[in-house]
Amino acid sequence: MQTAHSVAQVREHVRGWHRKGQSVGFVPTMGNLHDGHISLVREARTRCDVVVVSIFVNPTQFGPNEDFDRYPRTLDADAAALVEAGADLLFAPSVEEMYPLGQNQTWVDVDQLGDHLCGASREGHFRGVTTVVSKLLNIVQPDVAIFGEKDFQQLAILRRMCEELLFPVKIVGAATSRETDGLARSSRNGFLSESERTLAPQLYAHLQQVKTEIIGGERNYRALESRTSQSLNSTGFSVDYITIANARTLAPAGPDDTDLIVAVAAKLGSTRLIDNISLAVVRDR
């Protein structure tokens, strides 16, 4: 595996691959890699001739009171894991390389889809995500880009962005990677204390219970959200939202919606966790 720190270096590699007719898979990350990230790299490996992984902790997707400064930077360990996973190129740029004119110049913003769920409480977050991903796609020029379904809203927004801006890339969503107790793998799990880590799987357990109730015929979604939020709060979480949403629009679902996503964001101590579960329901007659 080779490592590049500049846009020019990546583009030189990409031109060489394209001349050979090789397909390029891309996995963008913020580093501190875990088994979930590695599963994305391996998915890209099965789909493409060469695989590029980026590691960049993007400042523009963090709010002023969020965890940008303490987000783990583990580049050496990450590089070793990527060699083992079969990546061909690691792109690890500086902030100055990605934002040469500063961080408040040109933005890419996807309306509506970013207004719900995490977007309602993390103003500017998805604008930062779409801006940096559009830059990365422009640099890497991949045929396929792999994202985890744990960040379902992000995945939906990036698919919309690529469709509307005519990026010649296939966006692939990979199933959420979980620990054996059901907790969705996340770099932020390392912030959890021992007691918080023991409690954390309850987030997914509550999502499963919501899914069971909907399959069983519950259609009063707002009441179900309220009950679930109260249960999580009483368990020790501080719930930001739990929403039963239309999987296409991400707006709160109604009884006539058939493709649903149940999404949750909650804090344990100072650590913010997100998760989701999808389901299809038969419309009531």
Swiss-Prot record:
Pfam families per record: Pantoate_ligase
Pathway entry: Cofactor biosynthesis; (R)-pantothenate biosynthesis; (R)-pantothenate from (R)-pantoate and beta-alanine: step 1/1
Compartment(s) of residence: Cytoplasm
Binding site for (R)-pantoate: 61, 154
UniProt keyword annotations, A-Z: ATP-binding, Cytoplasm, Ligase, Nucleotide-binding, Pantothenate biosynthesis
GO CC terms, sorted: cytosol
Active site annotation, chain numbering: 37
A molecular function (GO) term: ATP binding
Binding-site positions, beta-alanine: 61
InterPro entries in the cross-refs: Cyt_trans-like (IPR004821), Pantoate_ligase (IPR003721), Pantoate_ligase_C (IPR042176), Rossmann-like_a/b/a_fold (IPR014729)
The enzyme's E.C. designation: 6.3.2.1
Residues binding ATP: 30-37, 148-151, 185-188
GO terms, biological process: pantothenate biosynthetic process
CDD domains in the cross-refs: PanC (cd00560)
Catalytic reactions on record: (R)-pantoate + beta-alanine + ATP = (R)-pantothenate + AMP + diphosphate + H(+)
Family in the record: Belongs to the pantothenate synthetase family.
Chain's role: Catalyzes the condensation of pantoate with beta-alanine in an ATP-dependent reaction via a pantoyl-adenylate intermediate.
Subunit structure: Homodimer.
Other remarks in the entry: The reaction proceeds by a bi uni uni bi ping pong mechanism.
PANTHER family: CYTIDYLATE KINASE/PANTOATE-BETA-ALANINE LIGASE, PANTOATE--BETA-ALANINE LIGASE
Protein name: Pantothenate synthetase
